Amino acid sequence: MENIITATIFGSVILLAVAALATAIGFSLLGGKFLESSARQPELAASLQTKMFIVAGLLDAISMIAVGIALLFIFANPFIGLLN
């Protein structure tokens, strides 16, 4: 039983680390492309900023979903029920 709990915690930690890394890479690419495109065409900066915030919200949702899945696996572990 301890092996299942340990493996679940390690899996949850890896899930959270990958989600945080993917979100950080996504935000850096999004910010860089926004600055590049608004420097190229300053008259479209307001429209681009709105679209950037929408995509930033979707990027942030990825890590929130990963946190929810990790909390499910840590506190309501469905694999322990398979032991009996």
UniProtKB/Swiss-Prot annotation:
Any one Gene Ontology molecular-function term assigned to this protein's record: proton-transporting ATP synthase activity, rotational mechanism
Bilayer topology annotation: Multi-pass membrane protein
Cellular compartments annotated: Cell inner membrane
CDD domains (UniProt xref): ATP-synt_Fo_c_ATPE
Keywords, alphabetical: ATP synthesis, Cell inner membrane, Cell membrane, CF(0), Hydrogen ion transport, Ion transport, Lipid-binding, Membrane, Transmembrane, Transmembrane helix, Transport
Alphabetized Pfam families for the sequence: ATP-synt_C
SUPFAM superfamilies named among the record's database cross-references: F1F0 ATP synthase subunit C (SSF81333)
Main location: membrane
Stored InterPro entries: ATP_synth_csu_bac/chlpt, ATP_synth_F0_csu, ATP_synth_F0_csu_DDCD_BS, ATP_synth_F0_csu_sf, ATPase_proteolipid_c-like_dom, F/V-ATP_Csub_sf
Signal peptide start and end residues: none
Reversibly protonated during proton transport, annotated site positions: D60
Cellular component GO terms held in the UniProt record: plasma membrane; proton-transporting ATP synthase complex; proton-transporting two-sector ATPase complex, proton-transporting domain
Transmembrane segments: 9-29, 54-74
Entry function: F(1)F(0) ATP synthase produces ATP from ADP in the presence of a proton or sodium gradient. F-type ATPases consist of two structural domains, F(1) containing the extramembraneous catalytic core and F(0) containing the membrane proton channel, linked together by a central stalk and a peripheral stalk. During catalysis, ATP synthesis in the catalytic domain of F(1) is coupled via a rotary mechanism of the central stalk subunits to proton translocation.
Entries under NCBIfam families matching the protein: ATP_synt_c, PRK06876.1
Similarity comment: family membership: Belongs to the ATPase C chain family.
Complex and partners: F-type ATPases have 2 components, F(1) - the catalytic core - and F(0) - the membrane proton channel. F(1) has five subunits: alpha(3), beta(3), gamma(1), delta(1), epsilon(1). F(0) has three main subunits: a(1), b(2) and c(10-14). The alpha and beta chains form an alternating ring which encloses part of the gamma chain. F(1) is attached to F(0) by a central stalk formed by the gamma and epsilon chains, while a peripheral stalk is formed by the delta and b chains.
Protein name listed in UniProt: ATP synthase subunit c
